[in-house]
Amino acid sequence: MSQSRTYQVRTYGCQMNVHDSERLSGLLEAAGYQRAAEGTTPDVVVFNTCAVRENADNRLYGNLGQLRPVKDANPDMQIAVGGCLAQKDRGEIIRRAPWVDVVFGTHNIGSLPALLERARVQREAQVEIVESLERFPSTLPTRRESVYAAWVAISVGCNNTCTFCIVPALRGKEKDRRPGDILAEIRAVVAEGAIEVTLLGQNVNAYGSEFGDRQAFSKLLRACGEIEGLERVRFTSPHPRDFTDDVIAAMAETPNVMPQLHMPLQSGSDRILRAMRRSYRAERFLRIVEKVREAIPDAAITTDVIVGFPGETEEDFAETLRVMEEVRFAHAFTFQYSKRPGTPAASMDNQVPREVVKERYQRLLELQERISEEENAKFVGREVEVLVAEGEGRKDDVHRRMSGRARDNRLVHFAVDEGVTVRPGDMVTVEVTYAAPHHLVADSGIRNLRRTRAGDAWEARNAPERRPTGVLLGMPKVGAPEPQPSVVGGCCDS
């Protein structure tokens, strides 16, 4: 294979998919591919798909249809489809889009380079789906999108049986990574410049169930607190069933674990929670929130909510609104229920009419928008520490601002004084001057700027390549990647 073949990975879905795409990119580059420059047509396009939402199928097949004339004009181009939708649809993808070259599943992403080569040599589509994961794939190369913040997967799969969710069927039973492997990867990314790590799992706080340690997750959080140079630790997404007191204590007592918690509610109605097979009730959820706020008063709590689950009545929906008003989430990812073939909920009676779902959804949005704005308004006049990010603010250039995340993960847009150089990965302290439902603004200037190792790493990664002036041995070069859009919600949310 020519060393000049280029690739592009298109990612849909949750944070786990984003991290899987980093590993797919690492695999391709290890096999000699180069990332396609923006505006060019890649030799290989990889779709890393999601199967959680109803429009996932339409989105994939629509994009595949757009690529058909490109493939017709360039038969050597290859198209690969992986991820949860590939695990679900398998050979159906080739039937509906016969110009696709490779279909691979969630359990064998490491096979992608070999499958591409086999398809190229044999001139026929390759479909390879593995039914289950034998062990956690800890050794796959990774091309990280960020040098200052990193995803680190601690488990894959899920042992829950929520009636609306197809993820366990596609990702399999939970497989836990060994603690030593996790901590070794965290130390490695910190050595490369990262100062923030997010621990990932479909049900992240159930970590340890495979090897029989019910406190493994809290122990892991405390171990992260001992890693020199690691300034921020986050995790997503926990399940209320497994949110135990030892986890709350570890969050409160480990300084680099951030005061932020994303915990899916899904519904405030006990009747609907039972139909969803969620193994908690509203009172249990509220008690967890109470304990978290007792231990971590400044914690920002976010959630997921599904509107219009089969059988949901106006009384059930009112219970959801009541719980949301009581908790006062900093933010909520809200979804209109959609049928997923293969899930028990898809065949339930009493499917809620679409117009009713939309009307309730709008009321839910209006409530959460008000709460988010009221909670954010409490920050006006307060100073916050922000880890400067890349690609977080769509209008930063227009407003001459930069953006980043506060300790509690609130998005902050801040003005940069003329003549001051701030890099992604640096830390700034700013005073909030304005609050909106989804972000804070700090236009009064930077109170403190701390240049960090992460900022140094970002600067080194984005420095122009220098041409050698003598006769030197050829060394591999690392290009500057484009930032990937942040992805929220989705199948990581338990």
Curated annotation (Swiss-Prot):
Domain Radical SAM core residues, every copy: 144-374
Subcellular location: Cytoplasm
Necessary cofactors: [4Fe-4S] cluster
CDD domains: Radical_SAM
Reactions catalysed: N(6)-dimethylallyladenosine(37) in tRNA + (sulfur carrier)-SH + AH2 + 2 S-adenosyl-L-methionine = 2-methylsulfanyl-N(6)-dimethylallyladenosine(37) in tRNA + (sulfur carrier)-H + 5'-deoxyadenosine + L-methionine + A + S-adenosyl-L-homocysteine + 2 H(+)
Gene Ontology MF annotations: 4 iron, 4 sulfur cluster binding; metal ion binding; N6-isopentenyladenosine methylthiotransferase activity
InterPro entries per UniProt: Elp3/MiaA/NifB-like_rSAM, Methylthiotransferase, Methylthiotransferase_CS, Methylthiotransferase_N, Methylthiotransferase_N_sf, MiaB_methiolase, rSAM, rSAM_horseshoe
Gene Ontology cellular-component terms listed: cytosol
Residue positions binding [4Fe-4S] cluster 2: C158, C162, C165
Residues annotated as domain MTTase N-terminal: 5-121
Enzyme class of the recorded protein, top EC level: transferase
UniProt key word Phosphoprotein: no
Residue numbers spanned by region Disordered: 458-494
Keyword Transport: no
Amino acids binding [4Fe-4S] cluster 1: C14, C50, C84
Keywords on record: 4Fe-4S, Cytoplasm, Iron, Iron-sulfur, Metal-binding, S-adenosyl-L-methionine, Transferase, tRNA processing
Primary localisation category: cytoplasm
Domain named TRAM: residues: 377-446
Pfam family, one: UPF0004
Enzyme Commission number(s) of this protein: 2.8.4.3
Similarity-based family: Belongs to the methylthiotransferase family. MiaB subfamily.
PANTHER family the record matches: CDK5 REGULATORY SUBUNIT-ASSOCIATED PROTEIN 1, MITOCHONDRIAL TRNA METHYLTHIOTRANSFERASE CDK5RAP1
Oligomeric form and interacting partners: Monomer.
Record's function text: Catalyzes the methylthiolation of N6-(dimethylallyl)adenosine (i(6)A), leading to the formation of 2-methylthio-N6-(dimethylallyl)adenosine (ms(2)i(6)A) at position 37 in tRNAs that read codons beginning with uridine.
Name used for this protein in its record: tRNA-2-methylthio-N(6)-dimethylallyladenosine synthase
Annotated source species: Thermobifida fusca (strain YX)
Lineage: Bacteria, Bacillati, Actinomycetota, Actinomycetes, Streptosporangiales
